[in-house]
């Protein structure tokens, strides 16, 4: 019985991760269209075993104007309708441990 439940849970996690990555691809498309120089994903969305219903999608963005940042955040909310997300803009002041984590494990999301 527990094998059936664990398999079901694993299957649902895979579906959720796939959905999150599809949303990430749409978000990256939007960000590049708005002028981002680079879009990076980091943290649990890159780790299939670590992504679950409590996870969010972490995105780092390089080079967007201040006015674009605000409008982009609103548009991202429309993309990530039922999955939480965090976006950081690399030209802003961010905590050093977050910046180091992005540099260490961030993956450029292609256009």
Where are these regions (language model features)?
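Short hydrophobic/aromatic beta-strand micro-patches
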Residues: 60-62
């Amino acid at each position: 019985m527990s094998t059936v439940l664990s398999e079901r849970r694993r299957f649902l996690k895979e579906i959720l991760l796939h959905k999150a990555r599809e949303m990430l691809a749409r978000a990256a498309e939007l960000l590049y269209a708005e002028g981002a120089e680079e879009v990076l994903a980091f943290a649990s969305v890159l780790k299939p075993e670590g992504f679950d219903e409590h996870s969010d999608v972490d995105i780092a963005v390089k080079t967007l104007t201040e006015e674009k940042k605000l409008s982009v955040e609103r548009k991202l909310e429309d993309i990530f309708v039922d999955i939480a997300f965090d976006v950081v803009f690399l030209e802003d002041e961010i905590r050093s441990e977050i910046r180091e984590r992005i540099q260490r494990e961030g993956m450029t999301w292609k256009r």
